[in-house]
Amino acid sequence: MNSLFASTARGLEELLKNELEMLGAQSCKIVQGGVHFQGDGRVMYKSLMWSRLASRILLPLNEFNVYSDLDLYLGVQSIDWSQVFSVHSTFSVHFSGTNEEIRNTQYGALKVKDAIVDSFTRKLDQRPNVAKQQPDVRINVFLNKEKASVALDLSGDGLHIRGYRDLAGQAPLKENLAAAIVQRSGWQIGTPMVDPMCGSGTLLIEAAMMAADRAPGLHRDHWGFTAWLKHDEAIWREVITEAQIRFRKGLQETTCRFVGSDIDRRVLDMARSNARRAGVAQLITFQQGDASRLENPLPEGPAGTVLSNPPYGERLESEPALIALHSLFGRIMKSRFPSWRLSLFSASPELLSCLQLRAEREFKAKNGPLDCVQKNYLLSDKPHSSEVNVAEDYANRLRKNEKKLAHWAKQQGIDCYRLYDADLPEYNVAVDRYADKVVIQEYAPPKSVDANKARQRLFDVISATMQVLGLSSNQLVLKTRQRQKGKSQYERMAEKQEFFLVNEYDAKFWVNLTDYLDTGLFLDHRIARKMLGEMSEGKDFLNLFAYTGAATVHAGLGGARSTTTVDMSRTYLEWAERNLQANELTGRQHRLIQADCLAWLARANEQFDLIFIDPPTFSNSKRMEDTFDVQRDHIMLMRQLKRLLRRGGTLMFSNNKRGFKMDFAELEKVGLVAEEITSKTQSQDFARNRQIHNCWLLRHAGEEK
C-alpha cells in the first residue's frame, strides 16, 4: 500500500474524498487543500487517470523537523534518491512555505536541490541535471512552521491540464474546478445541459467527458511517474486500456445533449477546437448567441440544467450591462426553462441577486485568488411570462415619456434628450437617450434609505428600462450621481474610449458615455446653445468654463467671426477641438486656451461681443481664498466680465445653483442689467425640472432691449 496525498482547490476537499473512495482509495483523511489516502499501485494509477477534482497526486518520501537550513539539507539528503529516480533523469524542485530560518522559498528550493545533487554525487559520482520546463521528475517540498514534507509529484503537470486546451489561460476556470462545478450543479447524467455564456467551453466539455465516461487523464502526454524507478508500466498499461475501452463504449451509449452559446465568435472557435481535442465534439453543439435573448434550444424532452460561469465586474457601478444581463437572464429562466435546474458560479453574489430567484443550494469555492459562490436554483414547472411587471409604475411612466418625446426629438433634429428625471420619488434616477444608447444616472440615495432596497430598485429600473425601450445589454450605461469635489469631475471613471457622434440641430458632437462622470454634452443647455448660435453672426465669441466646447460649436456654425474657448482641463479642451473639427470649424480664428478660468479672466484685456459663462456652483480655485461659490461670488464675476464685454455686446450667464438669486442692487453698481431667460431655455424634456439651471442675459446699463 502506498501513502498518497491528493491536493485540490480549497472548498473541494469533501468532493475529492468521495471521488477517491469511488476509485478504491482507503483511509481517506481530509485536510485543508487536499486528502491523504492509502492505495495499492492500481488505485494510485487510477487516481491519476480518473480524478477530475485533484490538482496533483503526491507520493510522500520523508517528513522531518526543520530548525535551520542544515536540518533541511540533511533531511532531504537522508532520502536514498538513487532509489527514486535515475541520475540520467532531469528534475525540478517546487518549494512552498517558510519559517523563521527558511524565509525565502527560492532559497529553500536551492538547499533541496543541493541536497539531492550531493546525494547522487556521493553515491554514484554523478549528478542529475535540473530542468525548469517539463522535468522528468518533480520534487514537492512543503514547509509548515518546523515541519517539512518531501514528496514525489506523480502528476508532473497539474492534473487540471487534460490536454484539450492548447493555450494556457484561455479560460478563467481550471478544468478540475469546472468539473467540481458540474458535479455540484445537480445535473444528472442522461439529461441535457445548456451553457449560454460558455466561453471556451470548459464546463460543457467536462460534463460531456463525464457523460461519455472519458477519463480526464486519457489524453495527457506527460506524467511525473514515468521516471520513477518503482513505476509499474504493466499496471499503468492496464489502466490506460480500461480507460480507452470505457470511453469508446460511453461515447456510443450516451444520449446526453449539450448546447453552448456565446456572443463572441472567436471563443466559440476555441470551444469547438477544445471539444474536438477532448474527443467529445459530437456531443456538443456550439452556436453564437446573446444570453440576454436566450431561447430554450431543447424545449422537447427531459428538463435539464442551465450551467454557466457568467461574466462579472470589479465595480458593479461600472458594469450596468452585467446588471441588465443578470436581471433579464432571471426572467428568461423563469419563462423559457420550466422545471429545469439553473446553476451559476460567480465571484459576485450581488450580481446573482439580480436574477430575483431563490437559491435552493449554495456552495463556496476559490477560483484562484477570488472568493466565489455557486448557487443552484430549481425553476418552476409553470412558465412565467417573460413580460414580468418589474417596477411597473416606473415602466409605465417611461413608456409614456418615450412615446411623447421621441416624435418631438425627431422633429427638432436632436439625438439626445432626457426621458425621465425622478418623476416618481421611489425611482430616483435620470434616464437620458443618446441616439440608440441610454444612460441611467442614479442619484445617490440618502443615508436614511435602506441600501439593499435602493440597490434592488436600481436593478428593477435597469430591467424595466431595457424592457420598455427594447435595449440590448451593451446599449445601457449606468452612472452614480453625487456631489463632486475638487478635481473629481475631471477624473476618469473608465478607459473604454468609446466616442460616437450625435446630432443637435445642425451641430455634431462627440460623446463618451462611460469614461467620465458626464458625457460631454449637457442636455439641459441645448436651447441656450441654439440661442447663442442665433446671436453669434459676425461676433467675437468667448466661452468660459467651456467643458467640451458645445456652445462654441453653435457659435461657430452661427457665423461667429472668432471663438475663444477657455477651460482648465486639457482633456476637455482636446474634446472641444474634436467637436470643432467634426463641424469643419478649423483655423486660427478658433482659439482653445487651457487655464484656470477665474485667473485667466482677471488678467484678460481683450473684448468680445458675445460671452457665455456657465461656472460651477462651487469649486476650488487659487484665487478668492481657494474657493468659488456662484451665489457669493457672482457679482465679482460680473465685474470682471464687464471689462471684456464690448459696448452693444451680450453676456449669457447660466448656473445650476438651486434657488440662485441675482444681486440686482450690486449688479446696478457694476453697470450691468440682467434679464432672466430661464423659461426660454428649458426644453420639453426638462419640463418637470424647472430648477435644473437658471439663465440670464446681461448687457451694459442703458443698452436694454
From Swiss-Prot:
It holds the Pfam family THUMP. Its EC number is 2.1.1.173, 2.1.1.264. Gene3D superfamilies: 3.30.2130.30, RNA methyltransferase domain (HRMD) like, Vaccinia Virus protein VP39. It catalyses: guanosine(2445) in 23S rRNA + S-adenosyl-L-methionine = N(2)-methylguanosine(2445) in 23S rRNA + S-adenosyl-L-homocysteine + H(+); guanosine(2069) in 23S rRNA + S-adenosyl-L-methionine = N(2)-methylguanosine(2069) in 23S rRNA + S-adenosyl-L-homocysteine + H(+). It is found in: Cytoplasm. Keywords: Cytoplasm, Methyltransferase, RNA-binding, rRNA processing, S-adenosyl-L-methionine, Transferase. Residues 43-154 form the THUMP domain. One of its GO terms (molecular function) is rRNA (guanine-N7-)-methyltransferase activity. GO terms for cellular component: cytoplasm. Coiled coil: none annotated. Its main location: cytoplasm. It is an enzyme of class 2 (transferase). PROSITE patterns: THUMP, UPF0020. InterPro entries: 23SrRNA_methyltr_KL, DNA_methylase_N6_adenine_CS, RlmKL-like_Mtase, RlmKL-like_Mtase_CS, RlmL_1st, SAM-dep_methyl-trfase, SAM-dependent_MTases_sf, THUMP_dom. SUPFAM superfamilies: S-adenosyl-L-methionine-dependent methyltransferases. Belongs to the methyltransferase superfamily. RlmKL family. HAMAP family: 23SrRNA_methyltr_KL. Specifically methylates the guanine in position 2445 (m2G2445) and the guanine in position 2069 (m7G2069) of 23S rRNA. This is Ribosomal RNA large subunit methyltransferase K/L. It comes from Photorhabdus laumondii subsp. laumondii (strain DSM 15139 / CIP 105565 / TT01) (Photorhabdus luminescens subsp. laumondii).
